[in-house]
């Protein structure tokens, strides 16, 4: 029975639950790796890795790949996408139900490959970008890097199949009257993410496949001795790598839009503009990849183009930030836990974006490249963008998904812990970068000791917060119905939120701009067997 339900499942909701469990599992491993990294860097000299500098780089690779491919993408796209997208457009399931199943079940073998690569010979200590010649056969002669490449292949296939599924579902399975202009913002976010995945992943797969050939079959795509060029790999990788960071954050944009709207009791300001802004970000994201490569010897005109085109991305991003602020302005704001995360997201994502504008300048980036300033920048965007929106989405939708409620007070404590912890980790990294501390090193001169120690303290705070989050999930599953009594986050309210064209909204006690809260909680195995009508 269990095997039939969970192994052979073709039901989007069950597959989404599997994605969530997988994401939390991977996230715990990835966070543990980051804690080990920070403990090693807490003071100058060797702390806990006994001078094994290869192992340090292996931890960096493991942390990066786990957090990106095995936590954020399965969580935001696979989990929330599979569960909420059909509900938000009034579909009974995803378009290709069995394809959905294989999309998930390609991920555990990928995780096995990645973990196995850390158990073989000298492991893969290449940095998450897997640049040759360090990832070539001379520098890494063991099969570890090959296993890592297989893991990337499997996650890529998984994401591609999922992307095809999302696009087909939102194209074919919208309910009566749900035109594109009436689709909720989260659905738009998932569609735009799926298009980006579809266009960028094949390029990554091509790049790592060439690397595989270089390593095992004596080709010389990236081998200077045979007429190849490592810079080609960097172009292929970053043509995927830059859209990838938008793939990680755009579903978060969608979630934050829903939360800001619901807890301000207002429709999102400029909804169509928000869609255009997301689409512009996605389009421009494909035109800026070489800003990761200012120091490889691009000529001045190329650098000028990539500087200016990167700065242009700040415009649609600014439109989104100010539209969210306009949504909050004059709203009847309720500071439930999801709303706290959304407001923190706005503040911290903006800071991350501002440091990004500094890095966009080719002249400045020559100094900042490969320093901790870059680490601080992208962790502000990912840790306090993507991860905060994961938490926000969990606290917003999990009572609806599970029919069980979390402990509001514990959730507030967890929010403040991770808010403080994440800032204490990543703010000092900017200072270290300005002082010139390089990335991917396990040891450093004494001058950098102070801020590194502060950063490591923040890491411990954040890990405590994550442990508390795991406990909150446990408590939600055990005491979920008791918690319902004093939970403020749930989307119940007595007064009408805002005038709806749809009478069901107007008469229902549950207020949100989208239809998922009109269903039972938890929703039936197949919701919308009778099609809903969007007036």
From Swiss-Prot:
The lineage of its organism: Eukaryota, Fungi, Dikarya, Ascomycota, Saccharomycotina. The gene is COX1. GO terms for biological process: electron transport coupled proton transport; mitochondrial electron transport, cytochrome c to oxygen. Fe(II)-heme a binds at residues 63, 379. Mg(2+) binds at residues 369-370. Belongs to the heme-copper respiratory oxidase family. Its main location: mitochondrion. The keyword Kinase does not apply. Keywords: Calcium, Copper, Electron transport, Heme, Iron, Magnesium, Membrane, Metal-binding, Mitochondrion, Mitochondrion inner membrane, Respiratory chain, Translocase, Transmembrane, Transmembrane helix, Transport. This is Cytochrome c oxidase subunit 1.
